From Swiss-Prot:
Keywords tagged on the record: ATP synthesis, CF(1), Chloroplast, Disulfide bond, Hydrogen ion transport, Ion transport, Membrane, Plastid, Thylakoid, Transit peptide, Transport
Segment annotated as transit peptide: 1-60
Function of the protein: Produces ATP from ADP in the presence of a proton gradient across the membrane. The gamma chain is believed to be important in regulating ATPase activity and the flow of protons through the CF(0) complex.
UniProt subcellular location: Plastid, Chloroplast thylakoid membrane
Name recorded for this polypeptide: ATP synthase gamma chain 2, chloroplastic
Family: Belongs to the ATPase gamma chain family.
Primary location group: plastid
């Protein structure tokens, strides 16, 4: 033979070996151009031409492994796309629930503030509106029951953790009421949190029954003076692409606008706000009112025949239930929006990965076919020249 047949000829240029002394007998191997193998193959050239496009992801695998990975990515893409569609359908219902509940909640808060202001002017004390020096705070932390929603649960638990640390630095004890399976798992396995109760969501959408369970626990803690202040930590729904964890003061219902500790220092969170949901052009919007703003005046058209204390006794349970239900609804809407965005990103990543894997698979398959053809032709040429 004029030259030995081996795999090295695929990667190297023709050699000037003395074994082919005759200039007339050309080896087929000497006329072949080097075959370029890409990084996903086991045989890698020292230098690859800059004109040869490389895949965006360097994948090293055989043809069978690539085919299995492509099938796996396709199945994952179907799952993420289905979850995105489900979240998109549910987030619309959750958003509608928040918007439809806004007029009732807003009007109820205005009436309660007006009645409470009237009671304070008459030196009438109501248990849920008494501002005491803050020695202990109850945090109602609302999280989700499921994962696969980006950083939704992590953001609200981090917000609650920072709030607990801030209160402890001021020498104020803190007790946590966790709502949601993810929050329950987070707080229960950490010894630095004093967990009063862990509550799990019961249905697909929040109901007044679920809110009433939380309201009863909050009411008993505040009235028995086990805590001096109650705060809601939940995720505020702003839009389908934005949601922020916030802190909202639930009790006491006071016109003074702030709560102080035994030293007279304000213990309200810096971002503590009263949020009012509004709808503009059929879309959900948020109107913010700082704690320092003037509270609504008593309407001259609003007259009550009953005693203010009797009215507050009858309406405060409704107030607690409505505020907690609103927090649950906003948290659910934020969770669904976050899951929809996360699944959308996962679907896009799956499409891109499938594209890269398919390209690598086609190149590996083409290289294998080309190599087999070259071996057949080279073997035939060697037999002809022998």
């Amino acid at each position: 033979m004029t030259g030995s047949i081996s795999t090295s000829w695929l990667l190297s240029s023709p050699s000037n070996s003395n074994s082919a002394s005759s200039s007339e007998s050309y080896s087929f191997i000497a006329t072949l151009k080097p075959v370029r193998y890409y990084p996903f193959q086991s045989l890698t050239p020292n230098r690859i031409s800059s004109r040869s496009p490389l895949p965006s992801i360097q994948i090293r695998a055989g043809i069978r492994e690539l085919r299995e990975r492509i099938d796996s990515v396709k199945n994952t893409q179907k799952i993420t796309e289905a979850m995105r569609l489900v979240a998109a359908a549910r987030v619309r219902r959750a958003q509608d629930a928040v918007i439809k509940g806004r007029p009732f909640t807003e009007t109820l808060v205005e009436i309660l503030y007006s009645i409470n202001q009237s009671a304070q002017l008459e030196d009438i004390d109501f248990p849920l509106s008494i501002v005491r020096p803050v020695k202990r705070v109850a945090l109602v932390v609302v999280t989700g029951d499921k994962g696969l929603c980006g950083g939704f649960n992590n953001a609200v638990t981090k917000k609650a953790t920072l709030r607990v640390q801030e209160l402890k630095q001021r020498g104020i004890d803190c007790v946590v009421i966790s709502v949601g399976k993810k929050g329950n798992a987070y707080f229960s396995r950490r010894d630095e949190f004093d967990v009063d109760k862990c509550i799990e969501g019961g249905g697909v959408f929040p109901t007044t029954k679920e809110a009433q369970v939380i309201a009863d626990d909050v009411f008993s803690l505040f009235v028995s003076e086990e805590v001096d202040k109650v705060e809601l930590v939940y995720t505020k729904f702003v839009s389908l692409v934005k949601s922020d964890p916030v802190i909202h003061t639930l009790l006491p219902l006071s016109m003074k606008g702030e709560s102080c500790d035994v030293k007279g220092e304000c213990v309200d969170a810096i971002e503590d706000e009263m949020f009012r949901l509004t709808s503009k052009d059929g879309k959900l919007a948020v109107e913010r009112t700082k704690l320092e703003v003037e509270k609504p005046e008593i309407s001259p058209l609003m007259q009550f025949e009953q005693d203010p204390v009797q009215i507050l006794d009858a309406m405060m349970p409704l107030y607690l239930n409505s505020q907690i239900l609103r927090a649950l609804q906003e948290s659910l809407a934020s969770e669904l929006a976050s899951r929809m965005n996360a699944m959308s990103n996962a679907t896009d990543n799956a499409v891109e990965l499938k594209k890269n894997l398919t390209m690598a698979y086609n190149r590996a398959r083409q290289a294998k076919i080309t190599g087999e053809l070259l071996e057949i032709v080279a073997g035939a040429e060697a037999l002809r020249e022998s």
